[in-house]
Amino acid sequence: LSHSSAASDVYKRQASGFGQTGPLKELPAYDMVVQGMGGLMSVTGHPNSEPTRVGTSIGDITAGLFTAIGINAALYDRQKTGKGAFIDVSMLDCQIAILENAIARYLSKNEIPEPMGSRHPSIAPFEAFKTKDSFLIIAAGNDKLFKSLCEVLEIPNIANDEMYKTNSLRSQNIDKLKLIIEDKLQHKNTDEWIKVMENLKIPCGPIFNIKQAVENPQIKERNMIVKSFHKKIGEFKSAGNPINCLLYTSPSPR
């Protein structure tokens, strides 16, 4: 459907599995279907593992988000031009859109990405590392952060080592580097390492389960767990609105 298919002063929107055009336009879809067809499951999980679904309904959620963005863009355009629009959002298209890194690697290098666990394909160290008691996410996204990390781990010589002194070199030699890092991390618990790393502004964090995530003081401070009310079941708690507008409070959905 074209722009002119909408009335001159209104907009219409359609979010569907495969959109309003193309050979699949009449077919139904669920989140799981587009995760598979969009390539997302092919890069999720660990090497040689079975196809792995992302832990949330990302196919549904991204389609909703892109639809909301499209509606806002159409309203803004109507305000300026007086013209309406038809917004066509495909769940499958949204999966392609969010795989920007993987698709860029294929289109530019003819490289077909594979699952890498928690590892990043082009930044290192940028993954989960085992500590004395659990796992720790470390995201040393540039050379400066890597030098700070080496200071914390008391391996300053590694920062200037010919195998690790640049991000490109670290990515090439990440298996060896991970062994060095985890050897040092074994001496303290995750919480202890986080305190030290946060002092140097090294991006890091624990891996929480849902209970720990919900009870995180940061989440409570941000009003991300709210009380709601339903006429049949009464009061209940749910996830809040991540969009904070400082001019308004965030009321519970009713």
Give residue spans per PLM region:
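Active-site-adjacent "lid/gating" segments in soluble enzymes
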Residues: 8, 13-136, 140
